[in-house]
């Protein structure tokens, strides 16, 4: 993620230098990027470990564990989504099971594009589309699935 952040800064700096008149007209920046992934940030605001992205398949066993803990129908009825490896929640459960020392350091979990947003603005946040893709969002209530979060102890 730090390489991505450095590349973002270099690209923006280059564009501003190349197009100073146009860059003076910028009123805002929008973020678009990879949906599925897990970026973990500690209380100090720094990355805890490398991101786990959507293509990572290591959390297969954690998917069944999530369903066992929450009840498959309850889970799916809340998030309106099926679980898959590489989703934020399944990857987070993998970290909880296999990297307890890293799990304990977590203050925030964000999606990859939201890490860039955080670095640029200093604010943690996401949008409804990405939130729902993390598979721990109550889509009907448009809020985090706090009941599931409590059951999973995350």
Which residues does each PLM region occupy?
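General structural feature for long, well-ordered alpha-helical segments within catalytic domains
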Residues: 4-11, 59-62, 91, 112, ...
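Short, charged, surface-exposed secondary-structure boundary motifs
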Residues: 61-65, 136-138
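Short, surface-exposed amphipathic charged segments that create phosphate/polyanion-binding patches used
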Residues: 66-70
């Amino acid at each position: 993620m730090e390489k991505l952040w450095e590349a973002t800064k270099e690209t923006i700096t280059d564009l501003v230098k190349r197009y100073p008149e146009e860059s003076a007209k910028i009123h805002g920046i929008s973020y678009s990027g990879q949906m599925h992934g897990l970026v973990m940030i500690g209380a100090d605001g720094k990355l805890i470990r490398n991101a786990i992205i959507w293509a990572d398949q290591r959390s297969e066993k954690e998917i069944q564990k999530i369903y066992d803990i929450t009840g498959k129908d309850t889970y799916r009825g809340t998030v309106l989504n099926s679980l898959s490896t590489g989703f934020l929640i399944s990857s987070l459960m993998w970290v909880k099971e296999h990297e307890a020392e890293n799990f304990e350091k977590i203050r925030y979990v964000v999606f990859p594009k939201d890490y860039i947003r955080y670095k640029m603005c200093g604010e943690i946040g996401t949008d409804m589309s990405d939130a729902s893709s993390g598979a721990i969002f109550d889509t009907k209530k448009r809020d985090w699935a706090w009941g599931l979060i409590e059951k999973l102890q995350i």
